[in-house]
Amino acid sequence: MNDVPNLFGSMVFNDTVMQARLPKDSYKALKKAILQGAHLELDVANVVANAMKDWAVEKGATHFTHWFQPMTGITAEKHDSFISPAGDGTIIMEFSGKELVRGEPDASSFPSGGLRATFEARGYTVWDITSYAFIKDGTLCIPTAFCSYSGEALDKKTPLLRSMETLNQQALRILKLFGNTKTQRVITTVGPEQEYFLIDKQSYLKRPDLLYTGRTLFGARPPKGQELDDHYFGALKPRVSAFMKELDEELWKLGVHAKTKHNEVAPAQHELAPVFSTTNIATDHNQITMELMKSIADKHDLACLLHEKPFAGVNGSGKHNNWSLSTDDGANLLEPGETPYENAQFLLFLVAVVKAVDEYQDLLRVSVANAGNDHRLGANEAPPAIVSMFLGDELTEILEAIESGADYHNREKLQMEIGVTVLPHFFKDTTDRNRTSPFAFTGNKFEFRMVGSTFSISGPNIVLNTVVAESLALFADRLETASDFQSELAALIQETICAHKRIIFNGNNYADEWMQEAAQRGLSNLRTTVEALPAFISPKSMALFTKHHVFTDTEIHSRYEIFMESYCKTLHIEALTMVDMAKKYIIPACLSYENELAELLLRKKSCGDFDCSLEEYLLDKIASLSGYMLGKLTELELALITSKQEQETEPLARFYRDSVFARMSELRFTVDELETLVAKKHWPMPTYADMLYSAN
């Protein structure tokens, strides 16, 4: 495979294909609908559908599906064939504009947070014309939004599109104030860096916890973890390299701009990073990426683990959300330029983000909250649960100068001195990077690093788009009525810096001292999902989302219920899995080894006066720990029984966090210690050492 340009997008009904296959008037009408949000007439939809069907059939497709993203966090699809009876015992291949534009899946079988009852089954999928259709496994996949019969959004795409629209509207107001009348649309762009683990498939299949929950619920640390930092950017192992090569090719066929691949910090951990694209398209592409990672890994006798913390004791996996603002004519609104201190438009957009992150830090925390990410955030491997911003030395100095009214002296670009004459000379950047920051400015974009690896990026970007839109709306309200635009602009930037500078922190976010300082600054520290989620239904949050028409009140409350229920169900499944594994695997293994030790001890004693201290020690230690394990297992089972008595979602979630998870941790500690004592031939499942070094 060398012809990447021809391979790229070959399974996508993209703009090039549309131009070649659609009549000019139909193509123009479709492009107008895509670029300007104009209504697409049914006769045009019929033409597009027929062209799409012909193209798909030529590519080997036999079915089509409305591909949507319900509140499960993964994609959903129902496959219908193109065939239609011809009346003479034959068939024809048909696909109408109505079938393209709208579908009717069962809305009661997906999470709805009470929006849909079992008897209220009707839901609609609606074509997202801004995201290209593509062919996957012989099926034409049409990206769609998903709503209920009464119009409520039941998916992650609909509110994302709404948030992009409100940000577009408010950003255009700001640009017009600066005299820009050419820009017709402002879009948000995202490049999500996807981290994941690869282990041998046979090891995976022998671990019930990985099969049921995506993470290991038991497992002692191996002798070697990530201490030597020798896995990060290391040479790719042959099987991993073959997997990555096929993944690249399949992603390129589907128009995904897969760009960078490398080993990550933890053993068996890797990363794939794409080029930026429009946020809703980037969201679709990331869902495709995660799906293909799993299916292609399986073909290579590997298992792809996307959980935020599949292995204790080594780094977990995140998904850095690189977010920026661009115009339809190619300008990046977060590009500082050569002289950022003189770039008033950039500074206004910058402080709008600063204001948004400070005022809605709790909502940003909500957007990355789930049971899996609770294991990762604040664990000295990922940003803490405290939201702060890194701007770097240069921008921080500029903002400090504006705040104080002092003159700013531009930083000189320094040439990098390496001390080797044969190496090329280059200028160093004006600021370093801070990998511990949850929300960092990295040149011409913001990198939101708190997002978990399993997440759809729609949630974090819905919040980010909406809170920035709110800042821009307030700025526009003030500047549009100003008698002197320039003086009002200067005052607004200065006031915003003074009011929100507490959110800026360029230091070490892992340090204990930062937690104390953050508390003094008044920043929130919502350590767990259960602490964070109530902020989603606060009056302030609800007013924000309804003002910008991103969510209705009922949609907000339904999502809150879904998030809380998901947290409870996740911990419930994990706890049941631990109980099952302890009873069916761990206890029999311990008894088997105890029996072997007891028989050996009896034989040695019957043969003479031999030293039996080792056997006696092991037998006593394992028997003692086994008894203690039984006690902790019983406590966990009792906690699960008690959980059934609580009917309200929020108290139930607190019970799972405080009682069930605590019992799970105690049981795990005991089992992990037993693993270090029981002979390997008796231990019933692959260990961390077996799994983390299995994908060679």
List each model region and its residues.
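Glycine-rich, acidic/polar active-site loops that bind/position phosphate-bearing ligands
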Residues: 120-306, 315-318, 325-561
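Active-site core of metal-dependent hydrolases
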Residues: 7-120
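Gly-rich Lys/Arg/Thr-decorated short loops/hinges at beta-loop-alpha junctions or inter-strand turns
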Residues: 1-14, 33-35, 223-232
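Active-site proximal loops enriched in glycine and acidic residues that flank catalytic Cys/His/Asp
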Residues: 44, 68, 96, 274, ...
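Short linear, low-complexity motifs centered on an aromatic residue
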Residues: 73-89, 105-108, 113, 207, ...
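C-terminal amphipathic alpha-helical interaction region
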Residues: 498-696
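Catalytic pocket of metal/acid-base enzymes, prominently hydrolases
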Residues: 1-27, 41, 122-142, 442, ...
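Active-site-proximal loop/turn and secondary-structure-junction residues that shape catalytic pockets
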Residues: 44-48, 68-70, 98-99, 146, ...
